[in-house]
Every structure is written in C-alpha cells, then in structure tokens.
UniProtKB/Swiss-Prot annotation:
The lineage of its organism: Eukaryota, Fungi, Dikarya, Ascomycota, Pezizomycotina. InterPro entries: NADH_UbQ/plastoQ_OxRdtase_su3, NDAH_ubi_oxred_su3_sf. It comes from Neurospora crassa (strain ATCC 24698 / 74-OR23-1A / CBS 708.71 / DSM 1257 / FGSC 987). Keywords: Electron transport, Membrane, Mitochondrion, NAD, Respiratory chain, Translocase, Transmembrane, Transmembrane helix, Transport, Ubiquinone. This is NADH-ubiquinone oxidoreductase chain 3. It is found in: Mitochondrion membrane. The keyword ATP-binding does not apply. One of its GO terms (cellular component) is respiratory chain complex I. It catalyses: a ubiquinone + NADH + 5 H(+)(in) = a ubiquinol + NAD(+) + 4 H(+)(out).
C-alpha cells in the first residue's frame, strides 16, 4: 500500500506544479467583452448561432455505439488461447446482433447524409428499402475478380 500512497502523492504534486506554472506564465488580458455575461447582452463580433445538422449527430451516436461494441469484443480477442466453444457462440451471436442493427439502420436511411456534392440531380446516398436491395448494391465490380 506504501507504493500506492507514493504514487498518489507524486501525481498530486505534478498536478499542482502544472497548475502553478499555468497561473504564473499564462497571459492575463482582461477586457470588457471577456468579463461580461453572454446571456445578458453580449455583443458578439460575428454570428454565434449555427444550424445543427441532426443526421451528423445520429452518425456520431452510431460511431460511439460501434466503438463500445469493439471494446466489448477486446476481451475475447485477448484470450484467444483459452476460449471455449461457448465463448465463440456468444461472440458470434453478439456480432450477428451488431450486423443486424447495422442493416436496420441502413434500411431506415439513418446513415445517409445529404451533402452539397450529391444535391444535384443524381443522388448517391445509400438507402435500402428492403433486404433484396442489398444484392443490387454492386459493392465490388465483376472486373475485380478477373486475373
């Protein structure tokens, strides 16, 4: 327990040292706009309110969920030598649920983002109406399989 106490003491001293260095060497240039409240009549130099694109937020949430799913699979990969058949079934079931969720999101159109590049007459976003559309995606051209 003594080493843990020394570690906590060392980390606390380093944190206080960085705080003191910041207080001593940081520039302090106060002016009226910096000290006033934003809600009480702050006159900004430019527009501070920007429109928020909700499909991008939905993709960000999907990305965070994907990261959590990958972190959930890390212990399985780390213990490949001692895994049993049951653990293989569990991880395959988990991957099936993740894949089914991805196909569902793709089918609902949650992964499409309309950008200025595809706002012309030709829409290039990917939206599936049913599972039969997956075969018509042509994700890999036939010429890729020729030698």
């Amino acid at each position: 327990m003594r080493s843990m106490t020394l570690f906590i003491l060392f980390v606390s001293i380093i944190a206080l040292l960085f705080l003191l260095i910041n207080l001593v060497f940081a520039p302090h240039i106060p002016y009226q706009e910096k000290n006033s409240e934003f809600e009480c009549g702050f006159h900004s130099f430019h527009q501070t309110r920007f429109p928020f694109d909700s499909p991008i937020a939905a993709q960000a949430i999907c990305f965070v969920i994907l990261d959590l799913e990958i972190f959930t699979m890390f212990p399985y990969v780390g213990s490949l030598g001692i895994n049993t058949f049951y653990s293989l079934v569990v991880i395959l079931g988990f991957m099936f649920v993740v894949s089914a969720g991805f196909v569902f999101e793709l089918g609902k159109g949650a992964l499409k983002i309309d950008s200025k590049q595809n706002m012309g007459g030709d829409s290039t976003h990917l939206e599936l109406k049913n599972l039969k559309d997956i075969s018509s995606l042509n994700l890999c051209p036939p010429s890729a399989f020729k030698n």
